[in-house]
Design a protein with these regions (language model features):
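Short amphipathic beta-strand starts and helix->beta connectors
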Residues: 92-95, 177-181
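Right-hand nucleic-acid polymerase module
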Residues: 1-49, 54-110, 115-137, 141-149, ...
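Catalytic palm active-site di-aspartate
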Residues: 109-113, 155, 159, 180-197
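Long, hydrophobic, amphipathic alpha-helical segments used as structural scaffolds
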Residues: 79-84, 178-185
Length: 293
């Protein structure tokens, strides 16, 4: 069933003006915010980047902090966000990003360079003050809970939604530019996709996007700015839109599914399996489902 969503003015955090109220909303003991600094702890680890030999560093919160961040996410996730936002939205996934552009014969893809590294603390604070109308001290506490070392860490439950909210004005400006150029726009974290049934000037749109990004302290990853015509296969966040306007599974995902199947193959016919094996089976199911869509 579709999730009932409401305007930001209906969010429980809206116009939260006292720390006592914030403690109640975050399910903390009275006075719990006073000791918040002592539980702000993170650990770092590396994961493989998809379809690349590079590593991605993840900064993740410890258990207690993660639970509070999850509560903030819960309070924000039912707020209505723009239709063009795909990432972090319940009942949407990267497949929907590809599907949104099936009619687009002409496609421009733009990635933001080191997006998370350049997401700073100040726009997060301003989101709470200006959009959620909290008092400055409440905004500061919320910002302390979900930022680290002056930025948005990559491994928090709140990371995706806050990276969007901190720069929602920037993305809205880009959505308006797309509209002016007659393009459909979608956003998946830092991947922006623009498509149209008619030819448009990719250079003109790219220059305008560049200006908006720089205004907010970001810039495009130039090697990843790509323009595709009607006869091209168009890679869009883990999917491929074919010239026949259907969605295909890229070879990378096919290989991932094959490799994952080889790992779980010895388990066929066995009664019990370890928690790790169960996780691998669930992961394989998810990948097959993604490929089917």
């Amino acid at each position: 069933a579709p999730i009932r969503k409401y305007d930001i003015t209906q969010c429980a955090l809206y116009k939260c003006r006292t720390k006592k109220r914030l403690e109640h909303l975050l399910c903390l003991e009275p006075g719990g915010l006073k000791i918040i600094d002592s539980i702000i702890r993170y650990h770092k680890f590396e994961i493989d980047k998809k379809h690349s030999d590079e590593k991605r560093e993840i900064t993740a919160p410890d258990k207690i902090l993660k639970a509070i961040q999850r509560r903030i996410l819960y309070l924000l996730h039912r707020v209505i966000r723009p239709e063009w936002l795909i990432s972090g939205e319940k009942q949407k996934c990267y497949i929907d990003n590809g599907k949104a552009h099936l009619d687009g014969k002409y496609v421009l893809t733009v990635d933001i360079k080191k997006f998370y590294d350049n997401c700073t603390r100040e726009p997060v604070y301003q989101f709470f003050v200006q959009k959620l109308k909290t008092s400055p001290d409440v905004a500061k506490k919320l910002t302390d809970i979900i930022t680290y070392n002056g930025g948005i860490p990559t491994g928090c439950p709140t990371s995706q939604i806050m990276a969007f909210y901190a720069y929602s004005d920037m993305f809205s400006e880009i959505a308006d530019l797309a509209k002016q150029c007659g393009c459909k726009f979608t956003l998946y974290v830092d991947d922006m996709t623009f498509s149209s049934t008619k030819p448009f000037s990719p250079n003109q749109l790219r220059q305008m996007i560049d200006c908006v990004l720089r205004k907010y302290g970001h810039k495009p990853k130039y090697p990843k700015v790509k323009y595709y015509g009607p006869s091209d296969y168009k890679p869009i966040t883990g999917t491929v839109v074919t010239p026949e306007q259907s969605l295909a599974v890229p070879n990378g995902l096919q290989n991932t599914i094959y490799d994952a199947f080889q790992k779980v193959k010895p388990l066929i016919g066995t009664e019990a399996c370890s928690e790790e094996d169960a996780k691998q089976i669930l992961s394989l199911k998810g990948q097959i489902q993604a490929a089917r869509n």
